[in-house]
Regions:
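Flavin-dependent oxidoreductases
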Residues: 1-110
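C-terminal catalytic lobe of FAD-dependent flavoproteins
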Residues: 107-109, 113, 117-226
C-alpha cells in the first residue's frame, strides 16, 4: 500500500489498483495492513482459535434456540454455547484458545513469525498476567475433550463424550492494547485516505448491515473532506 496526496495505491503481485479512498477490513491482518500506511496504532491483533463440535443427529431436536452460558464480563468471549443451524443440526462452541498462527485453523498450526510477534508485544504479557488461569483452563479444554464436554454439560447434561463430532474451527482477530486490555468494542484506525476496521466483536455478524452503514458514513465524510 502507498498513500500520497492524490490517491492510494494497492500493489499486488499481479496488478496495481489506484483509488481515492480505501475501506479496509483485513481481519487477522488488520494491524499489519494499517502499519503499511504508517498509521500509528497502540494495539496488536492476537489470534484466538474458536473450536466447535457438531452433535450427533439424534440430538437435533435437543434445542430450538441459542443457549448461552453467563459470560465473564471481563472477557470479550461469549463462552461455549449450543446453536441450532439452518439445516437443523446442532453445533457446540466456540471456546477461545490462544492461536500460534494468525490463519491457523488446525489445533497444532504454528508460525514462528506470528508467535514471536505476540511474545514480543508488551500487551500480550499484560494479558497473560491478568488472565493466566482462564488461559490455561481454555488450553486444557482444547487438548482434552472431556474438559470441553463438562462445559457443555453445565446446561445440557444429557450430552455424552461420543456425541461430540468434529466441526471446523474459526479464528477470532482479537485486538489487544499495550496495557493488556482485550478490546470489547469496535475499533477503527484511519489515515487521510483510508479507514481500517481493526476489531469487530460480537454481534458484528448480526449487526453487519448497520455496521456497514456506519463505516460507509465515516468513509463518505472523510472522502468529502478531501475535496
Amino acid at each position: 500500500l502507498e498513500e500520497n496526496q492524490d490517491q492510494i495505491k494497492i500493489i499486488t503481485s499481479n496488478e496495481q489498483i489506484c483509488s481515492k479512498y480505501l475501506i479496509c477490513c483485513a481481519g487477522l491482518m488488520a494491524d499489519r495492513v494499517a502499519k503499511l500506511l504508517d498509521i500509528k496504532i497502540n494495539f496488536q491483533i492476537i489470534p484466538f482459535r474458536g473450536e466447535y463440535y457438531r452433535l450427533k443427529k439424534h440430538h437435533n431436536s435437543l434445542v430450538k434456540h441459542l443457549i448461552y452460558p453467563i459470560p465473564d464480563p471481563n472477557l470479550p468471549f461469549l463462552g461455549v454455547h449450543l446453536t441450532r443451524m439452518i439445516d437443523g443440526s446442532i453445533t457446540v462452541g466456540p471456546n477461545a484458545v490462544l492461536g500460534f498462527k494468525r490463519e491457523g485453523y488446525k489445533k497444532f498450526n504454528f508460525s514462528i513469525k506470528d508467535t514471536l510477534g505476540f511474545l514480543s508485544f508488551r500487551g500480550f504479557h499484560n494479558v497473560l498476567k491478568k488472565n493466566f488461569r482462564s488461559g490455561v483452563y481454555e488450553m486444557k479444554n482444547s487438548l482434552f475433550k472431556r474438559g470441553y464436554l463438562k462445559e457443555v454439560q453445565k446446561y445440557s447434561p444429557q450430552i455424552k463424550l461420543n456425541d461430540l463430532k468434529p466441526y471446523p474451527a474459526g479464528i477470532r482477530a482479537q485486538a489487544v492494547l499495550e496495557d493488556g486490555t482485550l478490546v470489547h468494542d469496535f475499533l477503527f484506525a484511519e489515515s487521510r485516505r483510508s479507514i481500517h476496521v481493526c476489531n469487530a466483536p460480537s454481534p458484528a455478524a448480526t449487526s453487519a448491515i448497520p455496521i456497514g452503514k456506519y463505516i460507509t458514513e465515516k468513509a463518505t465524510k472523510a472522502y468529502n473532506n478531501l475535496t
